């Protein structure tokens, strides 16, 4: 119906008047299913982390970041003291062969073909091929990862690093191969699509949620 949206999931089917899509790695595909005309592609980049051991944690009292290089689309490895008292270091940034490719060996033929059939992906690779190769080497070499971390903390040792988590960044790429660095939100009828929410979206999630709520009230004609 014109005033209803039908959402089909693996948990059943739902009818609703309004939908806010925050699809992350699937945001572009969800928008296309809703017939939204978009000019970007979501390409996944995995980031691997190490956790500092007990003897290594005392070397980090605060957040430690490198000076970002504006020529590259990624910040680089850094040290983050977590709320639980632990310290994680990373991430690197490597192209994933599966959108939800949280493991180094994850592969999906359809996802890979989808990413590599997009001209913007190849333009990104062409501009940053050396950076990309360095990132892949670091992903499979703990000594190389350590060497990069030692640029920030020279006293760090191999035994200070323990395997940590991995995350996948939903990078929104334009057709020109440039990373879309700002928020990208599209409106269509009774739906709002959050196509891109770059860093520091997680840090600012509550404030961003308030903004999207205001957008929904205006778009859908809702009252407080």
For each of these PLM feature ranges, what is it?
Residues 1-108:
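Flavin-dependent oxidoreductases
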């Amino acid at each position: 119906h014109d005033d209803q949206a039908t959402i089909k999931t693996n948990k059943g089917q739902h009818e609703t008047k309004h939908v806010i899509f925050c699809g992350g790695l699937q945001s572009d595909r969800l928008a296309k299913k809703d017939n939204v005309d978009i000019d970007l592609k979501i390409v996944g980049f995995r980031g691997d982390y190490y956790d500092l051991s007990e003897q290594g944690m005392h070397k980090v009292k605060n957040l430690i970041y490198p000076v970002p290089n504006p020529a590259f689309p990624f910040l680089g490895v850094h040290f983050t003291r977590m709320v639980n008292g632990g310290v994680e270091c990373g991430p690197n940034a490597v192209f994933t062969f599966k959108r939800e490719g949280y493991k180094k060996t994850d592969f999906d033929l359809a996802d890979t073909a989808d990413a590599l059939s997009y001209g913007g992906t190849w333009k990104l690779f062409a501009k940053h091929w050396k950076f990309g190769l360095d990132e892949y080497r670091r992903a499979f070499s703990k000594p190389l990862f350590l060497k990069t971390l030692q640029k920030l903390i020279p006293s760090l040792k191999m035994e200070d690093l323990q395997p940590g988590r991995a995350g996948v960044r939903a990078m929104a790429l334009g057709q020109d191969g440039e990373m879309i660095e700002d928020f990208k939100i599209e409106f269509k009828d009774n739906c709002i699509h959050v196509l891109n929410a770059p860093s520091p979206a997680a840090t600012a999630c509550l404030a961003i949620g308030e903004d999207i709520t205001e957008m929904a009230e205006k778009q859908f004609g809702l009252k407080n």
